[in-house]
């Protein structure tokens, strides 16, 4: 079977995008995501994002995200910008687009060529929102977490999907392939967790690496960047109401915490290529 696709990336967080607006999501999507995401052997990506017909009145489309291991995710900040860019270049040429996701409806505004700003909605540091267990009810903004014999100070933030944020002295020296899986599968997070390791440069500049559940280390994570800035704002490190620049391996995202604990994220959305895969 031949499968048309578009490969896109936001800060090098790359996905394979499928137009499922009429056909629906393929029945074998989990296996497809595992197969097509393999780097060096297939297209290679962090997963597949299906662009579907909207389910909410007034929305322009819906996205469903499937990680490289075939599991379905709730939300991807980099991915939703790319969905907006794809819709914009495929006949929905509106400066502001509305996209349904598994964590609610998101509004995305075009800020320039291949540049979009997403209204991510609110965040929560309460245990039930992640979920997290054996850590108290929350807010979980400065908690001890023992991982393979070492105790880390973490903040646990939900932005529609669960994140565990920890501050380190030197993010580049970390061996994420060793410690990332232990965080992801920690028993305190029954649905697994995404983990952000952040180095504070100053109050409005951060360096970050991320271990995503279901995908491993990725070069960027929009929701993870939002969770990181939210956590450091709660801790008094970053200022609310100001742009915070976060440098990831794949580029820069700009996050702002608004009144009411709402989040804005601004970043790129770039088409890499289009093609047809034999599946």
Language-model features, listed with the residues they occupy:
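A glycine-rich beta-to-alpha transition motif near the start of alpha/beta enzyme domains, typified by
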Residues: 1-112, 165-279
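Short, flexible, solvent-exposed loop/turn segments with mixed acidic/basic and small polar residues
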Residues: 5-7, 153-156
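Flexible, glycine/proline-enriched loop segments at strand-loop-helix junctions
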Residues: 73, 121, 128-133, 167
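Beta-strand scaffold of nucleotide-dependent catalytic cores
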Residues: 118, 155, 209
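Active-site glycine-rich loop that binds ribose-phosphate moieties when present
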Residues: 124-153
């Amino acid at each position: 079977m031949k499968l048309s696709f578009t490969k896109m990336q936001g800060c090098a967080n790359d996905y394979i995008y499928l137009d499922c607006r009429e056909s629906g999501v393929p029945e074998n999507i989990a296996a497809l995501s595992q197969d097509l995401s393999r780097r060096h052997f297939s297209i290679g990506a962090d997963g597949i994002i299906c662009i579907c017909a909207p389910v909410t009145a007034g929305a322009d489309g819906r996205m469903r995200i499937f990680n490289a291991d075939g599991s379905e995710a709730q939300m991807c900040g980099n991915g939703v910008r790319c969905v907006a860019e794809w819709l914009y270049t495929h006949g929905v040429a509106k400066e502001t687009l509305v996209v349904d996701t598994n964590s609610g409806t998101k509004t995305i505004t075009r800020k320039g060529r291949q540049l979009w700003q997403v209204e991510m909605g609110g965040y929560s540091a309460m245990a039930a929102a992640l979920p997290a267990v054996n850590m108290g009810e929350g807010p979980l903004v400065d908690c001890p977490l023992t991982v393979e014999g070492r105790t880390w100070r973490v903040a646990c933030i939900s932005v529609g999907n669960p994140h565990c944020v920890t501050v380190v002295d030197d993010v580049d020296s970390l061996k994420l392939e060793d410690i990332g899986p232990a965080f992801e599968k920690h028993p305190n997070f029954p649905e697994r967790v995404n983990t952000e390791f952040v180095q504070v440069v100053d109050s409005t500049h951060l360096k970050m690496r991320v271990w995503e559940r279901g995908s491993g280390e990725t070069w960027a994570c929009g929701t993870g960047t939002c969770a990181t800035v939210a956590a450091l704002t709660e801790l008094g490190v970053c200022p609310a109401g100001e742009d915070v620049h976060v440098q990831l391996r794949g580029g820069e995202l700009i996050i702002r915490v608004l009144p009411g604990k709402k989040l804005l994220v601004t970043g790129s959305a770039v088409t890499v290529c289009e093609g047809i895969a034999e599946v």
